[in-house]
Structures are given as structure tokens and as C-alpha cells.
């Protein structure tokens, strides 16, 4: 009799433990959209995220400026892409390639309002441009600076593909830190399988809370001709987009430090016993500031401004943050000997 009473209790306890493992949000009394749909018999939906984020994603158009005012007003409007309202003050982030060459920029909000936009500044290297409109009661995209994109996160891409109207596509973050994919040499893409089509560029990649994860920018297909892969799109991480936006608002341009080194990452393996066991950048070409400082081809750059070199991307980002004209120490390995040099930071050519 006791066994008959205890057995259902034991099964219930095991089931409860399994549910807590599968749905950890139940431990603190909250539920994800997915778990709510299971327990409440509701369809799974990201409509709340769309309601939060979509109003802040705008359509961007251009219009040719004609020398005759009346004809200028009647000039055809060309769809360019999308943009994201980042501030109630009217600042909008889009891609550099979306508005490059546009004579007059028109911004259309989802509530039907239309505004002329003024360019604040652009950065070709990161493919970011900032526009400004004069308007009140603007929706702003939510930004959570403490939430980093993680592989496997569900994301929504919001934009105006092919000018058919605002469209939402869904996928996951497939990878982070992708580099070397852009014609503008930008680094650290977010890769997603959410569809990013022509016209989505400059739009928002958001998480299931409607928070901005990145600025949609391109698909892998652009460089592959007829060999078009599916499910490979890229976005500029929010942190980088915000950083560039703030610099453009403040200065109208982005000034980066530069030392004039081309090189390859140097990371010796167990089979290279005759080489030094260090991480660094094997210099293939030195020019400008590095040449003047005494850096030579085949040197291994191992330290910049008292910080060890771990990767090309990290070191170039570090140098980019240094103010041109600043003198910093660097250490190179040359024929097995450490040599300290002083280098004057230059300005990265645009």
C-alpha cells in the first residue's frame, strides 16, 4: 500500500526536476515565450518583440536634386534600404553603402510620417552612416549594453526588402566575430541565418525582447556570383555601431591611429622548435610610422604600448584607439633578439 502511495509522488518529483532542467526560467517564476506556449497552449510568437522594435526601423529613400525647384519636387524617389532610430533626438544609423552618393535623403517612419534627413557623418571602414531628422515623439530602438550576442540566440531581422514594405525574418546567431568579409574591411560581424535581402541593409537585428543586437549589412552571396548560399547574412554588432555613431555625432568623422604595418599572425606550433614561442605579428611590410621607427620586414611585433600582441584584429583595434601624434613603445623580435622602439602614431588613411 505504501509503495502505491509513494510511487506517484516519486514520479512527480522526477518530472518536476526534469522540467526545471529543461526550462530553468521556471526556477525564478518567469517563463520564456516558448515555455509559455507549451504550458498555456498558446502559439509561439515574437509579436511583442516586433511591437517594441519595428516602429524604430525606417525606410530610406533618395531623391535627385534638380536645379529647377519645381522639377526637383517631382523627381523620382529611389528606395535605398533601411535605418534604425537610435535616439529621440532623431539620430538614425544605417549603412554607409546605403546612402553613399545619395543627393537628398528621405526617411519614412512606420506611422506614415516622412522627413528629409541630413547626413551627420559616415565611416566607410565600418560601413556606418548617421542621419538626423527633426521630429518629435520618435520611437527609439531598445539597447541593452549588458547583453552580448551569443551563438544560438534567436534573432529577428527587420527591414524593407525590395521596397515591398517592412518585413520580419527570423533565425539564430550562427557565429560571432566574423571578419575579412566586407569590401570596406570591417571586422567582427555577427553571422545569422535570418534572411537579409536587398533593402534590409541598415535595418535592425533584434533579440526576442526587441533589443538591438546589430545593424543588418550584407549577405555572403554578394561576393559569390551565381553560387548563392542560403542562410548566411551579417550584421554589425550594436556595441560597435553605437561607438561609431557617437564619434560621428561628436566629430563628424572617425579618426583612427595607424602604424603602417602589414603582417601575418605568428603563432608557432610544437613543430617549430627553432622559432621563438611567442604570439605576435610577423611583419611583411613596414611603411610610414613603423618604417620611420625602425621596424623591418620579418620582424615579429610582440608588444604595443606595453600590451602583448594576441591577434592582428585586437592589436589593430588597440592602435586605432590611440590618438595620432602619440608616441608609444613597441617591442619586436629580430633574429631572436628583443628590440624596443618608439613609434609615433599616424592617422589611418580613409
Region spans (language model):
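Active-site substrate-binding loop(s) of clan PA
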Residues: 48-49, 108, 118-120, 137-164, ...
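Gly/Ser-rich catalytic serine loop of serine hydrolases
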Residues: 75, 79-83, 141-144, 191-206, ...
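Short conserved beta-strand and strand-loop elements enriched in small hydrophobics
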Residues: 60, 104-110, 157-159, 327-332
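Active-site loop architecture of trypsin-fold serine endopeptidases
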Residues: 77, 102-104, 138, 158-170, ...
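Conserved hydrophobic positions within beta-strands
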Residues: 83-85, 117-119, 173, 283
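Short, well-ordered loop/turn sites that connect or cap secondary structure elements
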Residues: 86-87, 99-100, 143, 149, ...
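Glycine-biased strand-turn-strand hairpin within the trypsin-fold
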Residues: 23-93, 98-115, 125-128, 134-138, ...
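C-terminal recognition in membrane/secretory proteostasis and scaffolding
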Residues: 1-29, 48, 118, 132, ...
Amino acid at each position: 500500500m505504501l509503495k502505491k502511495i509513494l510511487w506517484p509522488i516519486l514520479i512527480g518529483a522526477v518530472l518536476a526536476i526534469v522540467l526545471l532542467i529543461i526550462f530553468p526560467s521556471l526556477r525564478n517564476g518567469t517563463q520564456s515565450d516558448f515555455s509559455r506556449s507549451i504550458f498555456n497552449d498558446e502559439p509561439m510568437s515574437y509579436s511583442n518583440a516586433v511591437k517594441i522594435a519595428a516602429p524604430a526601423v525606417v525606410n530610406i529613400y533618395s531623391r535627385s536634386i534638380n536645379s529647377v525647384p519645381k522639377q526637383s519636387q517631382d523627381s523620382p524617389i529611389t528606395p535605398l534600404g533601411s535605418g534604425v532610430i537610435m535616439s529621440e533626438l532623431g539620430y538614425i544609423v544605417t549603412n554607409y553603402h546605403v546612402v553613399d552618393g545619395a543627393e537628398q535623403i528621405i526617411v519614412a517612419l512606420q506611422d506614415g510620417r516622412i522627413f528629409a534627413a541630413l547626413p551627420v557623418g559616415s565611416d566607410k571602414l565600418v560601413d556606418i552612416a548617421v542621419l538626423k531628422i527633426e521630429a518629435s515623439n520618435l520611437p527609439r530602438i531598445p539597447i541593452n549594453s549588458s547583453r552580448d550576442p551569443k551563438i544560438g540566440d534567436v534573432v529577428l531581422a527587420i527591414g524593407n526588402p525590395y521596397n515591398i514594405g517592412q518585413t520580419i525574418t527570423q533565425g539564430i546567431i550562427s557565429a560571432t566575430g566574423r571578419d575579412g568579409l566586407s569590401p570596406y574591411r570591417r571586422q567582427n560581424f555577427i553571422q545569422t541565418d535570418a534572411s537579409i535581402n536587398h533593402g534590409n541593409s541598415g535595418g535592425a537585428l533584434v533579440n526576442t525582447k526587441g533589443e538591438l543586437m546589430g545593424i543588418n549589412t550584407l549577405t555572403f552571396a554578394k561576393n559569390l556570383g551565381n553560387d548563392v548560399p542560403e542562410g548566411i547574412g551579417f550584421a554589425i554588432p550594436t556595441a560597435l555601431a553605437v561607438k561609431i555613431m557617437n564619434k560621428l555625432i561628436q566629430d563628424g568623422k572617425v579618426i583612427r591611429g595607424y602604424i603602417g604595418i602589414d603582417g601575418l599572425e605568428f603563432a608557432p606550433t610544437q613543430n617549430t622548435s627553432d622559432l621563438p614561442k611567442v604570439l605576435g605579428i610577423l611583419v611583411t611590410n613596414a611603411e610610414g610610422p613603423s618604417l620611420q621607427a625602425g621596424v623591418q620586414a620579418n620582424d615579429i611585433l610582440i608588444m604595443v604600448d606595453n600590451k602583448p600582441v594576441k591577434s592582428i584584429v585586437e592589436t589593430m583595434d588597440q592602435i586605432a584607439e590611440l590618438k595620432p601624434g602619440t608616441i608609444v613603445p613597441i617591442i619586436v623580435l629580430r633574429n631572436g633578439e628583443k628590440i624596443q622602439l618608439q613609434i609615433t602614431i599616424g592617422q589611418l588613411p580613409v
